[in-house]
Amino acid sequence: MKILLASLCLISLLVILPSVFSASSSSEDFDFFYFVQQWPGSYCDTQKKCCYPNSGKPAADFGIHGLWPNYKDGTYPSNCDASKPFDSSTISDLLTSMKKSWPTLACPSGSGEAFWEHEWEKHGTCSESVIDQHEYFQTALNLKQKTNLLGALTKAGINPDGKSYSLESIRDSIKESIGFTPWVECNRDGSGNSQLYQVYLCVDRSGSGLIECPVFPHGKCGAEIEFPSF
């Protein structure tokens, strides 16, 4: 009898544990978003090169990379709901804006849907408790309109002309314009020079407002970095 009771307890525990672990990594469990924009010139002048989308060369402006749920300890959830795949029909009204503000630069050339699918399934599915698929992409587009990074930089005399600028001046000009401290990510061009690649801004859980970042990503840039043309 004791053996039977012990077996039943073990079976019950095995049934309960998966739901506990699932809940801990559910789409409800995140603290804030990183809103990440990338400079196309710095994507394309690396040794990997780039391919323009089917719609043609994007504008010389920062493009959306993604809207990423994140934890305050620096980790993040990913691929939270395989039952909610990307469905382009849900964002049919956004496609014109998506192609302009969220262009793909990956090779081979494409429409952008593979890029958006990746972003939704890896990151967007982890925010479903707050925003659905259409709202996820609409939120990113709204944030892009609110945060004119290129305008903030050019206003401060920081232009995409291949010259080097201080990392401090880049950060300060964005903060002065937008009101919040950015995180700047660098990569290296084909000659190994450090350059402005991506800018991270932090957004509250609702996706509606910018906030000061609870934590910044790892990595660092040099004191002087290039801002390449595109």
Swiss-Prot record:
Q: What induces it?
A: By phosphate starvation.
Which reaction is this enzyme known to catalyze?
a ribonucleotidyl-ribonucleotide-RNA + H2O = a 3'-end 3'-phospho-ribonucleotide-RNA + a 5'-end dephospho-ribonucleoside-RNA + H(+)
Q: PROSITE patterns, alphabetically?
A: RNASE_T2_1, RNASE_T2_2
Cellular component GO terms, alphabetical: extracellular region
What is the similarity comment for this entry?
Belongs to the RNase T2 family.
**What job does the chain carry out?**
May remobilize phosphate, particularly when cells senesce or when phosphate becomes limiting.
What's the protein name? Answer: Ribonuclease 1
Species: Arabidopsis thaliana (Mouse-ear cress)
Q: Tell me the gene name.
A: RNS1
